[in-house]
Amino acid sequence: MIRLVKRFAPIAVAGAALVSLALGLSACGSGGESVAGASAITAPPGIQTPANETAAGGRHGGTLTVLNHEEFEHLDPGEAYSSIDYEVIYATQRPLYSHKPNQLGEVMPDMASGPPQISSDRKTVTVHIRPGVHFSPPVNREVTSADVAYAIERGANPNVANPYFSAYFGSLQGASTANGGPFPGITTPNSRTIVFHLTEPKGQIVADALVLPLTAPVPEEFAKPLDEHKPSEYGNYLVATGPYMFKSNAQGKVLGIGYQPGKSAVLVRNPNWNPSTDFRPAYLNQINIQIGGDPEVIGRQVLEGSDMVENEEAAQPIVQLAYEHFRPQLEISPGAGINYIAVDNKQGPFANVDVRKAFWAALDRVALNKARGGELVTNVATHYIYPEIPGFAQAGGLKGPGVDYNDYPTGNMAVAAKYLRLAGYPGGRYTGAKTIQIVGATGSPNSTDAELVNQTLKNLGFKTHFSLVETATMYSKFCGVPAEQIDVCPSVGWVADFGDPQAVLDVPFNGEHIEPSGNPNYGQVDQPQIDAKMASAELLVGMPARAAAWAKIDRELVAQAVAIPFAWDKQPNVESKNVAGVGDEWNLGAWDYSFTSLK
Protein backbone atom coordinates (compact mmCIF):
# COMPACT_ATOMS: atom_id res chain seq x y z
CA MET A 1 0.00 0.00 0.00
CA ILE A 2 1.02 3.61 -0.38
CA ARG A 3 2.53 5.01 2.74
CA LEU A 4 3.73 8.48 1.79
CA VAL A 5 6.12 11.04 3.23
CA LYS A 6 7.26 10.35 6.78
CA ARG A 7 7.43 6.87 5.35
CA PHE A 8 9.10 9.44 3.29
CA ALA A 9 7.90 11.01 0.09
CA PRO A 10 7.16 9.61 -2.42
CA ILE A 11 7.89 6.11 -1.28
CA ALA A 12 4.89 3.90 -0.92
CA VAL A 13 4.08 1.34 1.71
CA ALA A 14 2.22 -0.71 1.67
CA GLY A 15 4.49 1.24 3.16
CA ALA A 16 6.89 -1.86 6.65
CA ALA A 17 8.00 -5.59 7.08
CA LEU A 18 7.10 -8.72 9.04
CA VAL A 19 7.33 -12.42 8.46
CA SER A 20 4.89 -15.23 8.13
CA LEU A 21 3.16 -15.45 11.46
CA ALA A 22 1.68 -18.85 10.85
CA LEU A 23 5.05 -20.59 11.08
CA GLY A 24 5.23 -20.23 14.83
CA LEU A 25 6.82 -16.80 14.31
CA SER A 26 10.11 -18.48 13.47
CA ALA A 27 12.93 -16.85 11.56
CA CYS A 28 14.01 -19.65 9.26
CA GLY A 29 12.56 -22.15 6.87
CA SER A 30 14.14 -25.39 5.77
CA GLY A 31 15.93 -25.78 2.50
CA GLY A 32 15.90 -22.13 1.47
CA GLU A 33 16.92 -18.63 2.40
CA SER A 34 16.12 -17.31 5.84
CA VAL A 35 12.69 -15.86 6.27
CA ALA A 36 14.34 -12.46 6.69
CA GLY A 37 15.52 -12.43 3.07
CA ALA A 38 19.32 -12.26 2.83
CA SER A 39 20.55 -9.13 1.10
CA ALA A 40 24.37 -9.06 1.31
CA ILE A 41 24.06 -5.31 1.88
CA THR A 42 26.37 -3.99 4.57
CA ALA A 43 27.22 -0.57 5.97
CA PRO A 44 30.76 0.91 5.94
CA PRO A 45 32.92 0.21 9.01
CA GLY A 46 31.94 2.12 12.13
CA ILE A 47 28.34 2.73 11.08
CA GLN A 48 25.45 1.13 12.92
CA THR A 49 22.73 -0.94 11.33
CA PRO A 50 19.64 -2.15 13.20
CA ALA A 51 21.01 -5.68 13.02
CA ASN A 52 24.13 -4.85 15.06
CA GLU A 53 22.41 -2.76 17.73
CA THR A 54 21.85 -4.38 21.12
CA ALA A 55 18.24 -4.52 22.27
CA ALA A 56 19.01 -5.86 25.76
CA GLY A 57 20.94 -4.48 28.71
CA GLY A 58 20.04 -0.80 28.42
CA ARG A 59 20.04 1.59 31.36
CA HIS A 60 16.66 2.31 32.89
CA GLY A 61 15.56 5.90 33.36
CA GLY A 62 16.02 9.29 31.77
CA THR A 63 14.22 11.43 29.24
CA LEU A 64 14.87 11.19 25.52
CA THR A 65 14.38 14.29 23.39
CA VAL A 66 13.26 13.69 19.82
CA LEU A 67 13.74 16.41 17.20
CA ASN A 68 11.58 15.99 14.10
CA HIS A 69 11.07 18.33 11.18
CA GLU A 70 7.92 16.47 10.12
CA GLU A 71 4.52 16.55 11.79
CA PHE A 72 2.54 13.45 12.70
CA GLU A 73 -0.20 12.39 10.31
CA HIS A 74 -2.40 10.34 12.68
CA LEU A 75 -2.13 9.27 16.32
CA ASP A 76 -5.21 7.03 16.13
CA PRO A 77 -3.95 3.44 15.61
CA GLY A 78 -6.86 2.88 13.25
CA GLU A 79 -5.66 5.65 10.95
CA ALA A 80 -1.87 5.69 11.39
CA TYR A 81 0.08 4.81 8.26
CA SER A 82 3.46 6.52 8.29
CA SER A 83 6.84 5.80 9.79
CA ILE A 84 6.85 8.75 12.15
CA ASP A 85 3.36 7.82 13.41
CA TYR A 86 4.31 4.17 13.87
CA GLU A 87 7.10 5.00 16.33
CA VAL A 88 4.65 6.50 18.83
CA ILE A 89 1.86 4.03 18.00
CA TYR A 90 3.98 0.95 18.72
CA ALA A 91 5.30 2.51 21.96
CA THR A 92 1.78 3.23 23.23
CA GLN A 93 -0.31 0.44 21.68
CA ARG A 94 -0.12 -3.34 21.55
CA PRO A 95 -1.36 -4.93 18.30
CA LEU A 96 -1.97 -8.66 18.20
CA TYR A 97 1.63 -9.10 17.00
CA SER A 98 4.63 -6.78 16.94
CA HIS A 99 8.06 -6.76 15.37
CA LYS A 100 11.27 -7.34 17.19
CA PRO A 101 13.04 -4.04 16.65
CA ASN A 102 16.30 -4.77 14.88
CA GLN A 103 15.42 -7.59 12.54
CA LEU A 104 12.80 -8.48 9.97
CA GLY A 105 12.93 -12.18 10.70
CA GLU A 106 10.96 -12.39 13.91
CA VAL A 107 7.53 -11.20 14.96
CA MET A 108 6.41 -11.56 18.56
CA PRO A 109 2.96 -12.28 19.98
CA ASP A 110 1.96 -9.01 21.62
CA MET A 111 -1.73 -8.82 22.56
CA ALA A 112 -1.86 -12.39 21.29
CA SER A 113 -0.68 -15.17 23.59
CA GLY A 114 0.73 -17.28 20.76
CA PRO A 115 0.88 -17.64 16.97
CA PRO A 116 -2.27 -17.43 14.85
CA GLN A 117 -3.93 -20.71 13.97
CA ILE A 118 -4.85 -21.03 10.29
CA SER A 119 -7.38 -23.71 9.42
CA SER A 120 -6.57 -26.37 6.83
CA ASP A 121 -8.90 -24.72 4.31
CA ARG A 122 -7.20 -21.35 5.03
CA LYS A 123 -10.58 -19.69 5.59
CA THR A 124 -10.39 -19.34 9.37
CA VAL A 125 -7.74 -17.64 11.52
CA THR A 126 -7.95 -18.00 15.30
CA VAL A 127 -5.99 -15.91 17.80
CA HIS A 128 -5.97 -16.19 21.58
CA ILE A 129 -5.64 -13.00 23.62
CA ARG A 130 -3.04 -12.50 26.34
CA PRO A 131 -4.45 -12.05 29.87
CA GLY A 132 -3.28 -9.36 32.28
CA VAL A 133 -3.05 -6.41 29.86
CA HIS A 134 -4.91 -3.31 31.01
CA PHE A 135 -5.92 -0.06 29.34
CA SER A 136 -4.35 3.15 30.61
CA PRO A 137 -6.42 5.74 32.49
CA PRO A 138 -9.22 6.64 32.33
CA VAL A 139 -10.48 3.19 31.20
CA ASN A 140 -8.37 1.15 33.65
CA ARG A 141 -9.77 -2.30 32.84
CA GLU A 142 -8.40 -5.51 31.39
CA VAL A 143 -8.34 -5.91 27.62
CA THR A 144 -10.62 -8.57 26.09
CA SER A 145 -11.10 -10.01 22.62
CA ALA A 146 -14.07 -7.67 22.14
CA ASP A 147 -11.68 -4.71 22.27
CA VAL A 148 -9.60 -6.16 19.46
CA ALA A 149 -12.76 -6.90 17.46
CA TYR A 150 -13.97 -3.32 17.83
CA ALA A 151 -10.55 -1.98 16.83
CA ILE A 152 -10.62 -3.87 13.53
CA GLU A 153 -14.33 -3.24 12.91
CA ARG A 154 -13.79 0.51 13.20
CA GLY A 155 -11.31 0.24 10.34
CA ALA A 156 -14.36 0.00 8.06
CA ASN A 157 -15.94 3.09 9.62
CA PRO A 158 -15.76 5.90 7.03
CA ASN A 159 -15.08 8.29 9.90
CA VAL A 160 -11.88 6.37 10.61
CA ALA A 161 -11.08 5.45 7.00
CA ASN A 162 -8.28 3.00 7.65
CA PRO A 163 -6.02 2.95 4.56
CA TYR A 164 -5.41 -0.81 4.41
CA PHE A 165 -8.59 -2.43 5.79
CA SER A 166 -9.90 -3.45 2.36
CA ALA A 167 -6.51 -4.67 1.15
CA TYR A 168 -5.83 -7.07 4.01
CA PHE A 169 -9.17 -7.63 5.71
CA GLY A 170 -11.43 -7.37 2.67
CA SER A 171 -11.70 -11.16 2.44
CA LEU A 172 -13.46 -11.35 5.82
CA GLN A 173 -17.13 -12.32 5.62
CA GLY A 174 -19.24 -9.17 5.41
CA ALA A 175 -16.26 -6.83 5.10
CA SER A 176 -17.49 -5.35 1.82
CA THR A 177 -20.59 -3.92 3.51
CA ALA A 178 -19.11 -3.25 6.96
CA ASN A 179 -19.30 0.34 8.19
CA GLY A 180 -17.76 0.28 11.65
CA GLY A 181 -20.00 -2.11 13.54
CA PRO A 182 -19.94 -5.90 14.01
CA PHE A 183 -19.90 -8.08 10.89
CA PRO A 184 -19.81 -11.87 10.41
CA GLY A 185 -16.11 -12.06 9.57
CA ILE A 186 -15.05 -11.35 13.18
CA THR A 187 -16.38 -13.32 16.14
CA THR A 188 -15.32 -13.55 19.79
CA PRO A 189 -16.40 -16.93 21.23
CA ASN A 190 -15.03 -15.86 24.61
CA SER A 191 -13.13 -12.99 26.18
CA ARG A 192 -9.77 -14.54 25.26
CA THR A 193 -10.43 -15.66 21.67
CA ILE A 194 -10.99 -13.84 18.38
CA VAL A 195 -11.79 -15.70 15.16
CA PHE A 196 -11.57 -14.36 11.60
CA HIS A 197 -13.89 -15.99 9.04
CA LEU A 198 -12.90 -15.56 5.39
CA THR A 199 -14.79 -15.93 2.13
CA GLU A 200 -11.58 -16.99 0.33
CA PRO A 201 -8.59 -19.13 1.38
CA LYS A 202 -6.45 -16.10 2.24
CA GLY A 203 -5.68 -16.96 5.83
CA GLN A 204 -1.96 -16.36 5.43
CA ILE A 205 -2.16 -12.73 4.37
CA VAL A 206 -4.77 -12.00 7.04
CA ALA A 207 -2.46 -13.57 9.63
CA ASP A 208 0.44 -11.48 8.34
CA ALA A 209 -1.60 -8.29 8.62
CA LEU A 210 -2.28 -8.84 12.33
CA VAL A 211 0.99 -7.02 13.01
CA LEU A 212 -0.52 -3.74 11.80
CA PRO A 213 -1.70 -1.12 14.31
CA LEU A 214 -5.36 -1.55 13.36
CA THR A 215 -5.33 -4.67 15.55
CA ALA A 216 -4.36 -2.76 18.71
CA PRO A 217 -7.32 -2.98 21.14
CA VAL A 218 -9.71 -0.03 21.40
CA PRO A 219 -12.35 0.14 24.18
CA GLU A 220 -15.73 0.59 22.50
CA GLU A 221 -17.33 2.32 25.48
CA PHE A 222 -14.65 5.03 25.31
CA ALA A 223 -14.07 5.33 21.56
CA LYS A 224 -17.50 4.81 19.99
CA PRO A 225 -18.87 8.30 20.85
CA LEU A 226 -15.67 9.77 19.40
CA ASP A 227 -15.96 7.61 16.28
CA GLU A 228 -19.38 9.10 15.56
CA HIS A 229 -17.70 12.37 14.61
CA LYS A 230 -16.53 12.87 11.02
CA PRO A 231 -13.62 12.47 11.14
CA SER A 232 -13.29 10.40 14.31
CA GLU A 233 -11.94 12.29 17.31
CA TYR A 234 -10.44 9.23 18.98
CA GLY A 235 -6.98 10.48 18.01
CA ASN A 236 -7.58 13.43 20.34
CA TYR A 237 -8.56 11.18 23.29
CA LEU A 238 -6.27 8.17 23.32
CA VAL A 239 -6.12 5.11 25.55
CA ALA A 240 -2.89 3.10 25.66
CA THR A 241 -1.99 -0.54 26.23
CA GLY A 242 1.77 -0.23 25.67
CA PRO A 243 4.50 0.85 28.10
CA TYR A 244 3.97 4.52 27.26
CA MET A 245 0.97 6.80 26.84
CA PHE A 246 0.48 10.33 25.61
CA LYS A 247 0.30 12.74 28.51
CA SER A 248 -3.41 13.43 29.00
CA ASN A 249 -5.99 14.82 31.40
CA ALA A 250 -8.38 12.82 33.60
CA GLN A 251 -10.78 12.34 30.66
CA GLY A 252 -8.04 10.89 28.45
CA LYS A 253 -7.76 14.02 26.31
CA VAL A 254 -4.41 14.22 24.57
CA LEU A 255 -4.93 17.15 22.21
CA GLY A 256 -3.49 20.33 23.69
CA ILE A 257 -1.92 18.43 26.59
CA GLY A 258 0.32 15.59 25.47
CA TYR A 259 0.17 16.67 21.85
CA GLN A 260 0.45 20.24 20.60
CA PRO A 261 0.00 20.07 16.79
CA GLY A 262 2.99 21.46 14.97
CA LYS A 263 4.88 21.96 18.22
CA SER A 264 5.38 19.01 20.52
CA ALA A 265 4.29 15.68 21.98
CA VAL A 266 5.06 14.02 25.31
CA LEU A 267 5.04 10.30 26.07
CA VAL A 268 5.02 9.26 29.73
CA ARG A 269 4.87 5.87 31.38
CA ASN A 270 1.55 4.03 31.32
CA PRO A 271 0.85 3.32 35.02
CA ASN A 272 -1.23 0.25 34.10
CA TRP A 273 1.48 -1.40 31.98
CA ASN A 274 2.60 -4.77 33.32
CA PRO A 275 6.14 -5.60 32.13
CA SER A 276 5.61 -9.31 32.82
CA THR A 277 3.16 -9.40 29.89
CA ASP A 278 5.45 -7.61 27.40
CA PHE A 279 8.71 -8.28 25.55
CA ARG A 280 9.59 -4.57 25.48
CA PRO A 281 12.05 -3.39 28.15
CA ALA A 282 10.84 0.25 28.01
CA TYR A 283 13.99 1.75 29.51
CA LEU A 284 13.10 5.43 29.18
CA ASN A 285 10.94 7.29 31.68
CA GLN A 286 9.73 9.90 29.21
CA ILE A 287 10.01 10.90 25.56
CA ASN A 288 9.73 14.59 24.65
CA ILE A 289 9.12 15.17 20.94
CA GLN A 290 9.75 18.58 19.38
CA ILE A 291 8.13 19.19 16.00
CA GLY A 292 9.35 21.57 13.30
CA GLY A 293 12.57 23.29 12.38
CA ASP A 294 15.17 23.11 9.65
CA PRO A 295 16.29 19.50 9.02
CA GLU A 296 19.96 20.47 8.80
CA VAL A 297 19.81 22.43 12.06
CA ILE A 298 18.00 19.54 13.74
CA GLY A 299 20.57 17.02 12.55
CA ARG A 300 23.50 19.09 13.80
CA GLN A 301 21.83 19.62 17.18
CA VAL A 302 21.39 15.88 17.58
CA LEU A 303 24.95 15.01 16.56
CA GLU A 304 26.55 17.67 18.75
CA GLY A 305 24.14 17.40 21.71
CA SER A 306 23.10 14.74 24.20
CA ASP A 307 19.99 12.71 25.03
CA MET A 308 18.57 13.31 21.52
CA VAL A 309 17.61 11.52 18.34
CA GLU A 310 16.12 12.60 15.05
CA ASN A 311 13.41 10.11 14.20
CA GLU A 312 13.08 10.74 10.48
CA GLU A 313 15.42 10.49 7.53
CA ALA A 314 18.46 12.70 8.10
CA ALA A 315 19.14 15.41 5.50
CA GLN A 316 21.91 14.62 2.99
CA PRO A 317 24.38 17.21 4.40
CA ILE A 318 23.85 15.75 7.88
CA VAL A 319 24.49 12.24 6.61
CA GLN A 320 27.76 13.42 5.10
CA LEU A 321 28.70 15.27 8.30
CA ALA A 322 27.92 12.23 10.42
CA TYR A 323 29.83 9.93 8.10
CA GLU A 324 32.94 12.11 8.28
CA HIS A 325 32.91 13.24 11.92
CA PHE A 326 30.24 11.37 13.96
CA ARG A 327 30.29 7.94 12.39
CA PRO A 328 29.30 5.93 15.51
CA GLN A 329 26.18 8.12 15.77
CA LEU A 330 24.99 7.26 12.26
CA GLU A 331 22.70 4.33 11.53
CA ILE A 332 22.05 3.02 8.03
CA SER A 333 19.04 0.74 7.69
CA PRO A 334 18.66 -1.53 4.64
CA GLY A 335 15.30 -2.66 3.37
CA ALA A 336 13.83 0.85 3.24
CA GLY A 337 11.91 0.32 0.02
CA ILE A 338 12.27 0.61 -3.72
CA ASN A 339 12.13 3.53 -6.14
CA TYR A 340 11.14 2.83 -9.72
CA ILE A 341 9.98 4.51 -12.90
CA ALA A 342 6.38 3.74 -13.80
CA VAL A 343 5.61 3.51 -17.52
CA ASP A 344 2.16 3.14 -19.05
CA ASN A 345 1.85 -0.53 -19.99
CA LYS A 346 -1.68 -0.06 -21.38
CA GLN A 347 -1.43 2.56 -24.11
CA GLY A 348 1.15 4.50 -26.09
CA PRO A 349 4.68 3.41 -27.01
CA PHE A 350 5.33 1.70 -23.68
CA ALA A 351 2.54 -0.78 -24.28
CA ASN A 352 5.26 -2.52 -26.34
CA VAL A 353 7.51 -4.61 -24.08
CA ASP A 354 10.55 -4.01 -26.28
CA VAL A 355 10.17 -0.24 -25.97
CA ARG A 356 10.08 -0.67 -22.20
CA LYS A 357 13.25 -2.77 -22.35
CA ALA A 358 14.95 -0.14 -24.51
CA PHE A 359 14.18 2.57 -21.96
CA TRP A 360 15.46 0.33 -19.14
CA ALA A 361 18.68 -0.38 -21.05
CA ALA A 362 19.36 3.30 -21.77
CA LEU A 363 18.78 4.61 -18.26
CA ASP A 364 21.73 5.60 -16.07
CA ARG A 365 20.53 4.15 -12.77
CA VAL A 366 23.85 4.99 -11.10
CA ALA A 367 23.24 8.69 -11.73
CA LEU A 368 19.76 8.40 -10.22
CA ASN A 369 21.28 6.77 -7.13
CA LYS A 370 23.93 9.48 -6.82
CA ALA A 371 21.16 12.07 -6.71
CA ARG A 372 19.88 10.27 -3.62
CA GLY A 373 23.24 10.27 -1.86
CA GLY A 374 25.02 7.37 -3.51
CA GLU A 375 26.02 3.97 -2.19
CA LEU A 376 25.85 4.98 1.47
CA VAL A 377 22.06 5.34 1.32
CA THR A 378 21.03 3.44 -1.83
CA ASN A 379 21.89 0.46 -3.98
CA VAL A 380 21.17 0.22 -7.68
CA ALA A 381 17.99 -1.82 -8.00
CA THR A 382 17.97 -4.72 -10.44
CA HIS A 383 14.49 -6.11 -9.74
CA TYR A 384 11.45 -5.41 -7.56
CA ILE A 385 11.65 -7.48 -4.33
CA TYR A 386 14.04 -5.37 -2.31
CA PRO A 387 16.70 -6.36 0.26
CA GLU A 388 15.56 -7.92 3.54
CA ILE A 389 12.25 -9.11 2.04
CA PRO A 390 11.87 -12.90 1.67
CA GLY A 391 12.41 -13.94 -1.94
CA PHE A 392 15.05 -11.26 -2.58
CA ALA A 393 17.85 -13.77 -3.17
CA GLN A 394 15.75 -16.11 -5.32
CA ALA A 395 14.61 -13.18 -7.46
CA GLY A 396 18.22 -12.39 -8.33
CA GLY A 397 19.76 -10.81 -5.26
CA LEU A 398 21.95 -7.78 -5.80
CA LYS A 399 22.98 -8.72 -9.34
CA GLY A 400 19.50 -9.33 -10.68
CA PRO A 401 18.09 -11.96 -13.02
CA GLY A 402 20.70 -11.61 -15.78
CA VAL A 403 19.01 -9.94 -18.75
CA ASP A 404 20.98 -7.65 -21.02
CA TYR A 405 18.76 -4.58 -20.56
CA ASN A 406 19.44 -4.81 -16.81
CA ASP A 407 23.16 -5.60 -16.99
CA TYR A 408 24.47 -2.04 -17.49
CA PRO A 409 23.68 0.19 -14.48
CA THR A 410 25.08 3.29 -16.19
CA GLY A 411 23.05 2.58 -19.33
CA ASN A 412 23.90 1.07 -22.70
CA MET A 413 22.57 2.77 -25.81
CA ALA A 414 23.58 -0.14 -28.07
CA VAL A 415 21.36 -2.53 -26.11
CA ALA A 416 18.60 0.09 -26.13
CA ALA A 417 18.87 0.39 -29.90
CA LYS A 418 18.61 -3.40 -30.22
CA TYR A 419 15.24 -3.40 -28.45
CA LEU A 420 13.92 -0.42 -30.38
CA ARG A 421 14.69 -2.31 -33.59
CA LEU A 422 12.80 -5.31 -32.17
CA ALA A 423 9.92 -2.92 -31.44
CA GLY A 424 9.75 -1.95 -35.12
CA TYR A 425 12.08 1.04 -35.35
CA PRO A 426 14.78 -0.09 -37.83
CA GLY A 427 17.18 2.73 -37.04
CA GLY A 428 17.29 1.89 -33.36
CA ARG A 429 15.64 5.19 -32.42
CA TYR A 430 12.02 5.99 -31.69
CA THR A 431 10.40 7.66 -34.70
CA GLY A 432 6.76 7.60 -33.65
CA ALA A 433 4.54 10.67 -33.62
CA LYS A 434 3.37 10.55 -30.01
CA THR A 435 4.67 13.09 -27.52
CA ILE A 436 5.48 11.36 -24.25
CA GLN A 437 3.80 12.81 -21.15
CA ILE A 438 6.18 12.89 -18.18
CA VAL A 439 5.02 14.07 -14.75
CA GLY A 440 7.58 14.19 -11.96
CA ALA A 441 7.73 15.62 -8.46
CA THR A 442 9.36 18.86 -7.39
CA GLY A 443 12.23 18.95 -4.93
CA SER A 444 15.47 17.03 -4.74
CA PRO A 445 16.06 14.25 -5.61
CA ASN A 446 12.74 13.76 -7.42
CA SER A 447 13.21 16.65 -9.83
CA THR A 448 16.68 15.33 -10.68
CA ASP A 449 15.17 11.92 -11.40
CA ALA A 450 12.62 13.47 -13.71
CA GLU A 451 15.15 15.56 -15.60
CA LEU A 452 17.45 12.60 -16.18
CA VAL A 453 14.53 10.45 -17.34
CA ASN A 454 13.40 13.20 -19.69
CA GLN A 455 16.86 13.49 -21.23
CA THR A 456 17.20 9.72 -21.59
CA LEU A 457 13.95 9.55 -23.54
CA LYS A 458 15.04 12.42 -25.78
CA ASN A 459 18.30 10.57 -26.45
CA LEU A 460 16.21 7.61 -27.63
CA GLY A 461 14.31 9.83 -30.08
CA PHE A 462 11.15 10.56 -28.08
CA LYS A 463 9.45 13.94 -28.07
CA THR A 464 8.40 14.76 -24.52
CA HIS A 465 6.09 17.04 -22.56
CA PHE A 466 7.74 17.45 -19.17
CA SER A 467 6.02 18.68 -15.98
CA LEU A 468 7.01 18.92 -12.31
CA VAL A 469 4.33 19.19 -9.62
CA GLU A 470 4.13 18.72 -5.86
CA THR A 471 4.48 15.09 -4.77
CA ALA A 472 0.91 14.79 -3.50
CA THR A 473 -0.41 16.30 -6.73
CA MET A 474 1.72 13.94 -8.81
CA TYR A 475 -0.02 10.98 -7.19
CA SER A 476 -3.55 12.33 -6.74
CA LYS A 477 -4.00 14.19 -10.05
CA PHE A 478 -1.70 12.45 -12.50
CA CYS A 479 0.16 9.19 -11.79
CA GLY A 480 -2.74 7.74 -9.79
CA VAL A 481 -5.40 8.63 -12.38
CA PRO A 482 -5.31 6.33 -15.46
CA ALA A 483 -7.59 8.65 -17.46
CA GLU A 484 -4.79 11.23 -17.50
CA GLN A 485 -2.75 8.83 -19.68
CA ILE A 486 0.61 9.77 -18.19
CA ASP A 487 3.28 7.81 -20.03
CA VAL A 488 6.09 8.11 -17.48
CA CYS A 489 6.15 8.82 -13.73
CA PRO A 490 9.87 9.07 -12.97
CA SER A 491 10.13 8.51 -9.22
CA VAL A 492 7.42 6.47 -7.59
CA GLY A 493 8.17 3.87 -4.99
CA TRP A 494 6.99 1.25 -2.57
CA VAL A 495 7.55 0.13 1.02
CA ALA A 496 5.91 -3.12 2.09
CA ASP A 497 3.49 -3.12 5.02
CA PHE A 498 5.14 -6.32 6.20
CA GLY A 499 7.93 -8.62 5.14
CA ASP A 500 5.99 -10.80 2.76
CA PRO A 501 6.91 -10.50 -0.94
CA GLN A 502 3.23 -10.31 -1.81
CA ALA A 503 3.18 -6.95 0.00
CA VAL A 504 5.85 -5.72 -2.45
CA LEU A 505 4.54 -7.05 -5.77
CA ASP A 506 0.79 -7.54 -5.60
CA VAL A 507 -0.72 -4.07 -5.37
CA PRO A 508 1.60 -2.12 -7.71
CA PHE A 509 1.80 -4.79 -10.43
CA ASN A 510 -1.49 -6.72 -10.35
CA GLY A 511 -4.17 -5.74 -12.85
CA GLU A 512 -6.81 -6.47 -10.20
CA HIS A 513 -5.73 -3.31 -8.38
CA ILE A 514 -6.12 -0.77 -11.19
CA GLU A 515 -8.48 1.93 -9.90
CA PRO A 516 -9.99 5.01 -11.64
CA SER A 517 -8.51 7.27 -8.96
CA GLY A 518 -6.03 6.74 -6.17
CA ASN A 519 -4.61 4.03 -8.41
CA PRO A 520 -1.53 2.36 -6.85
CA ASN A 521 -0.78 0.43 -10.05
CA TYR A 522 0.76 3.51 -11.67
CA GLY A 523 1.81 1.75 -14.87
CA GLN A 524 -1.56 -0.02 -15.33
CA VAL A 525 0.34 -3.29 -15.34
CA ASP A 526 -2.12 -6.00 -16.36
CA GLN A 527 -0.53 -9.28 -17.39
CA PRO A 528 -3.27 -11.95 -17.09
CA GLN A 529 -0.84 -14.87 -16.86
CA ILE A 530 1.17 -13.16 -14.12
CA ASP A 531 -2.02 -12.07 -12.33
CA ALA A 532 -3.12 -15.71 -12.26
CA LYS A 533 0.19 -16.75 -10.74
CA MET A 534 -0.17 -14.01 -8.13
CA ALA A 535 -3.61 -15.33 -7.25
CA SER A 536 -2.13 -18.80 -6.70
CA ALA A 537 0.88 -17.54 -4.74
CA GLU A 538 -1.39 -15.51 -2.48
CA LEU A 539 -2.95 -18.72 -1.17
CA LEU A 540 0.29 -20.41 -0.15
CA VAL A 541 1.03 -20.92 3.54
CA GLY A 542 4.61 -20.93 4.82
CA MET A 543 7.28 -18.39 3.96
CA PRO A 544 9.69 -20.68 2.07
CA ALA A 545 6.95 -21.57 -0.41
CA ARG A 546 5.68 -18.00 -0.62
CA ALA A 547 9.18 -16.57 -1.09
CA ALA A 548 9.93 -19.01 -3.92
CA ALA A 549 6.62 -18.38 -5.70
CA TRP A 550 6.79 -14.59 -5.48
CA ALA A 551 10.46 -14.59 -6.53
CA LYS A 552 9.43 -16.36 -9.74
CA ILE A 553 6.75 -13.73 -10.26
CA ASP A 554 9.39 -11.02 -9.74
CA ARG A 555 11.49 -12.58 -12.50
CA GLU A 556 8.48 -12.66 -14.82
CA LEU A 557 7.75 -9.01 -14.11
CA VAL A 558 11.37 -8.19 -14.98
CA ALA A 559 11.02 -10.24 -18.18
CA GLN A 560 8.08 -8.01 -19.10
CA ALA A 561 9.93 -4.86 -17.96
CA VAL A 562 6.70 -3.62 -16.37
CA ALA A 563 8.54 -0.80 -14.56
CA ILE A 564 12.16 0.27 -14.27
CA PRO A 565 13.60 -0.23 -10.77
CA PHE A 566 16.53 2.04 -10.01
CA ALA A 567 17.10 2.40 -6.25
CA TRP A 568 16.83 0.18 -3.20
CA ASP A 569 16.81 2.60 -0.31
CA LYS A 570 18.82 2.44 2.90
CA GLN A 571 17.63 5.02 5.41
CA PRO A 572 20.09 7.16 7.43
CA ASN A 573 19.20 8.00 11.05
CA VAL A 574 21.23 9.94 13.64
CA GLU A 575 21.50 10.01 17.44
CA SER A 576 23.48 11.82 20.14
CA LYS A 577 26.67 10.22 21.46
CA ASN A 578 25.13 9.18 24.78
CA VAL A 579 22.08 7.49 23.25
CA ALA A 580 22.00 3.72 22.83
CA GLY A 581 19.57 3.72 19.95
CA VAL A 582 17.87 0.59 18.66
CA GLY A 583 16.38 0.94 15.21
CA ASP A 584 13.28 -0.72 13.86
CA GLU A 585 14.51 -2.43 10.72
CA TRP A 586 10.87 -3.12 9.82
CA ASN A 587 10.22 0.66 9.96
CA LEU A 588 13.14 2.16 8.00
CA GLY A 589 15.47 1.89 10.98
CA ALA A 590 13.59 4.58 12.92
CA TRP A 591 14.52 4.61 16.59
CA ASP A 592 12.31 2.36 18.74
CA TYR A 593 11.29 4.22 21.91
CA SER A 594 10.61 0.98 23.77
CA PHE A 595 14.16 -0.35 23.27
CA THR A 596 16.31 2.80 23.01
CA SER A 597 18.06 3.95 26.19
CA LEU A 598 20.50 6.56 27.47
CA LYS A 599 24.06 5.48 28.23
What does each of the following model-derived ranges do?
Residues 51-57, 357, 369, 383, ...:
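Extracytoplasmic/peripheral linker and loop segments enriched in polar/acidic and small residues
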Residues 102, 180-181, 210-281, 286:
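Gly/Pro-rich hinge or "lid" segments in bacterial periplasmic/extracellular proteins
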Residues 250, 376-423, 442-448:
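Structural transition elements
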Residues 573-599:
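Long beta-strand-rich cores associated with HINT superfamily self-processing modules
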Residues 232-238, 266-321, 463:
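Ligand-site clamp/hinge motif
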